[in-house]
């Protein structure tokens, strides 16, 4: 069995060393393609994020996600998420910081009109480049989600994924 997985992920999140009373604008874009024999799967995701840094190390806001999954020979599946997040940042120096994002919310998909909840915890490293621009690196996290649809058994997933994925992003913080 031959498997090809191409992933392009751009992660735009807040500047981890941002100052109090600043706005976070960001998100990520991802694409993957997988082919096994005659079967082909394509996945596209866009996940925006908006928040407010209310204390030197704390940010809270709203996050969302739109995912489109196309499988050869079947209907296209669409999945939507909307929820909140909170971020705690620990500066290590003027250049490096680590942060953790905790998010939770509502999700739905057009497959069997399923609806449910999600939650995730993602640790990351921030590298401050210049004037509020920086790079973010995360290598996985912990996540849980459930979906319950018409004529379909309830789905529950728990993931513990460290070191299997790498997300690299650009970030910018806007002061008020």
Feature map (PLM): residue ranges:
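Surface-exposed strand-loop-strand hairpins of Gram-negative outer-membrane beta-barrel proteins
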Residues: 31-49, 63, 150, 154-156
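Hydrophobic secondary-structure block in the mid-to-C-terminal portion of proteins
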Residues: 141-176
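Short, hydrophobic/glycine-enriched beta-strand segments
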Residues: 24-28
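Gram-negative (and chloroplast) outer-membrane scaffold detector with strong preference
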Residues: 31, 47-135, 167, 172-176
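Transmembrane beta-barrel outer-membrane domains
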Residues: 20-22, 39-43, 75-81, 112-118, ...
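Cleavable N-terminal export/targeting peptides
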Residues: 1-22, 175-176
């Amino acid at each position: 069995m031959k498997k090809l997985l191409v992933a392009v992920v751009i992660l735009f999140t807040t500047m981890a060393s941002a100052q109090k009373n600043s706005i976070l604008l960001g998100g990520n874009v991802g694409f993957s393609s997988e082919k096994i024999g005659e079967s082909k799967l394509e996945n596209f995701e866009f996940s925006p994020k908006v928040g407010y840094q209310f204390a030197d190390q704390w940010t809270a806001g709203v996050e969302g996600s739109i995912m489109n999954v196309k499988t050869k020979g079947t209907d296209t599946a669409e999945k939507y998420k909307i929820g909140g997040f909170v971020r705690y940042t620990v500066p290590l120096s003027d250049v490096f910081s680590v942060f953790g994002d905790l998010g939770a919310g509502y999700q739905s998909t057009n497959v069997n009109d399923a609806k449910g909840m999600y939650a995730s915890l993602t640790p990351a490293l921030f590298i401050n480049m210049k004037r509020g621009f920086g790079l973010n690196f995360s290598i996985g996290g912990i996540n849980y989600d459930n979906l319950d649809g018409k004529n379909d058994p309830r789905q529950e997933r728990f993931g513990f994924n460290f070191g299997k994925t790498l997300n690299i992003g650009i970030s910018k913080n806007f002061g008020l």
